[in-house]
Regions:
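Beta-strand initiation motifs
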Residues: 22-31, 73-80, 118-122, 160-164
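Beta-propeller domains
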Residues: 29-37, 49-85
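Repeated scaffold domains used in trafficking and secretory/extracellular systems
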Residues: 37-52, 85-100, 124-144, 169-197
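Blade-loop segments of beta-propeller domains
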Residues: 75-107, 112-113, 120-124
Length: 204
């Protein structure tokens, strides 16, 4: 029961408790090297990013090299992917998937996309003021753009154009709060009980 400040009004709530059936301390891990080859013996001290596209898992280790394997447990087998047309200033950790395509941002704030994980092209219509891409939801790609020295949230639905123009005229975008992570990003997407998509984000 919840009692209001007037000491008279009372509202009664019913709680439903769900018990997790999996003991988190007894999760079983599998050494995947026993299931197939590892993707590389090279120690990479630079940026890396793992991202899923369709039924394949890609691991990017540079602007010219990636490795991929099927996400199906019985088809685990890494192969090298020769990456083309990603500039040297690409931020590998910025990679996100949306609408069957991958997207990355560069230090020069440009956006590149790929439908197969190997061949990339610049999405010039998204401009050259993109700070970061936040996440690919079911119906939109969310990101942060810079306008007149300030950062704003924006969304793209067709993979090519922002819904709000990148202009200061009649600006209705929400400004990004101080401290919002834009580098070395990790995200986790979930759905609420009523189907609303939510994303948890960590970075700096």
């Amino acid at each position: 029961k919840a009692h209001a400040a007037d000491g008279v009004t009372v509202r009664e709530y019913k709680l439903k408790v769900n018990v997790h059936l999996q003991d988190p301390d007894s999760l079983v891990w599998t050494d995947m090297q026993k299931r197939g080859n590892i993707f590389s013996n090279t120690i990479n001290l630079g940026q890396q990013k793992a991202v899923v596209l369709g039924d394949e898992l890609f691991v990017y280790t540079s602007n010219s090299t990636a490795y991929k394997t099927s996400t199906a447990p019985d088809k685990y087998n890494w192969s090298k992917v020769n990456v083309s047309n990603l500039p040297s200033d690409v931020k590998l950790t910025s990679a996100v998937e949306y609408n069957n395509a991958l997207y990355m941002v560069t230090e020069s704030k440009r956006v590149f996309s790929s439908t197969n994980g190997g061949a990339w092209t610049e999405v010039t219509t998204l401009g050259d003021n993109v700070i970061v891409l936040i996440n690919g939801f079911s119906d939109r790609l969310s990101g942060i753009v810079e306008i007149n020295g300030k950062q704003y949230f924006n969304i793209c639905k067709d993979g090519k154009n922002w819904e709000a123009e990148n202009t200061a005229d009649n600006l209705t975008l929400e400004e990004v709060p101080a401290g919002f992570p834009t580098e070395n990003i990790s995200t986790t997407q979930t759905n609420t009980g009523n189907g609303v998509e939510k994303v948890g984000r960590a970075g700096r």
